[in-house]
């Protein structure tokens, strides 16, 4: 039939358009088929109020998170982290003093061992994840992690907002590449309240960035919060509250998340590395002291 021949001639064009729209995230029916595999990661350098608030909110939703707490916080609030570990939270070690780029192996090993012992003394569970400042790592980090039996090190994002896992063939330790997003002229950084705040973002702008990421249909992502920011301040917490209710994301425990991510096994030399940090000195649009706290934290110092 003439009309059928005409339709057949146009079918490749329609198909090409559909594929193009799918790639940029404009086909809702395709987007709705597979929810994003999402992981919440909490970081704490200060006190405990933000972590406790996150714990309450996640508990109401039947969720847990990956938590990185600096050694001083672990030591000051050991009962909290013992409880969190018992509830199923994965407690990661962190050395925030320096990025582990081009740091001697012996120093990395000693620092990592100290962190591991501190975490395990409190949680009574093996420390499976480690990260340094800016999620920096190099081959010495992998060597040290292998020597200490640490399963994962955290790395700066190398695939945009897509979070992924690399398995260097030379090592047993895997690299978790976190979600990474650009902002203005301040380069790229983690999909994280502090990272965006330090680059001059407001809570409203963070909401816009995150909304676009969640709508893009990524297979896997990591949403990070410095709990003393996102867990305490109203404008920033509301962004996370909305994200937790997003029907296009399945928020997973750490074990569920890593088991669902496709592992990229390749030689270390072929694994991409990101060393860009343009916000070493924060340049916030609104300083912390001028942000409005959540009602239950007003009048408290942190």
Predicted regions and their residues:
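N-terminal secretory signal peptides that target proteins for export/translocation
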Residues: 1-10
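Bacterial N-terminal signal peptides
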Residues: 14-25
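Boundary/entry segment of secreted carbohydrate-active catalytic domains
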Residues: 32-53, 289-299
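C-terminal domain-boundary segment and adjacent tail
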Residues: 58-65, 73-76, 83, 152-158, ...
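Metal-dependent polysaccharide deacetylase catalytic core of the NodB/CE4 family, i.e.
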Residues: 61-141, 160-164, 171-194, 219-226, ...
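Short, surface-exposed basic-aromatic patches at helix termini and helix-loop junctions that form
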Residues: 82-87, 142-151, 168, 241-245
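Short hydrophobic/aromatic-enriched beta-strand-loop microsegments
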Residues: 90-92, 149-156
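Aromatic-anchored helix/helix-loop segment that forms the rim or "lid"
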Residues: 183-214
């Amino acid at each position: 039939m003439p009309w059928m021949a005409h339709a057949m001639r146009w079918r490749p064009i329609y198909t090409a358009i559909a594929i193009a729209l799918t790639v940029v995230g404009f086909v809702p029916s395709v987007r709705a088929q597979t929810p994003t595999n999402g992981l919440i990661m909490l970081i704490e350098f200060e006190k405990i109020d933000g972590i406790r608030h996150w714990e309450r909110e996640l508990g109401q939703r039947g969720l847990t998170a990956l938590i990185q707490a600096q050694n001083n916080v672990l030591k000051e609030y050991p009962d909290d982290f013992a409880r969190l570990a018992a509830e199923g939270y994965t407690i990661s070690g962190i050395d925030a003093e320096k990025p582990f780029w081009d740091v001697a192996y012996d120093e990395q090993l000693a620092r990592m061992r100290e962190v591991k012992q501190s975490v395990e003394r409190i949680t009574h569970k093996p420390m499976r994840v480690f990260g340094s400042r800016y999620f920096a790592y190099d081959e010495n980090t992998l060597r040290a992690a292998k020597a200490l039996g640490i399963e994962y090190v955290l790395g700066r994002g190398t695939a945009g907002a897509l979070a992924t896992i690399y398995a260097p063939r030379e090592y047993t330790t895997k690299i978790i590449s976190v979600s990474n997003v650009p902002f203005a002229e301040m380069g790229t950084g983690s999909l994280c309240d502090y990272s965006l705040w330090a680059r001059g973002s407001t809570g409203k702008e963070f909401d816009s960035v995150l909304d676009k990421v969640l709508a893009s249909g990524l297979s896997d992502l990591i949403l990070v919060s410095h709990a003393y920011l996102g867990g305490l301040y109203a404008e920033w917490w509301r962004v996370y509250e909305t994200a937790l209710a997003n029907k296009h994301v399945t928020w997973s425990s750490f074990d569920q998340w890593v088991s669902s991510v496709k592992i990229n096994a390749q030689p270390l030399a072929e694994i991409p590395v990101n060393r860009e940090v343009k916000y070493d000195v924060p340049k916030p649009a609104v300083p912390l002291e001028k942000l409005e706290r959540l009602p239950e934290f007003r009048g408290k110092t942190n």
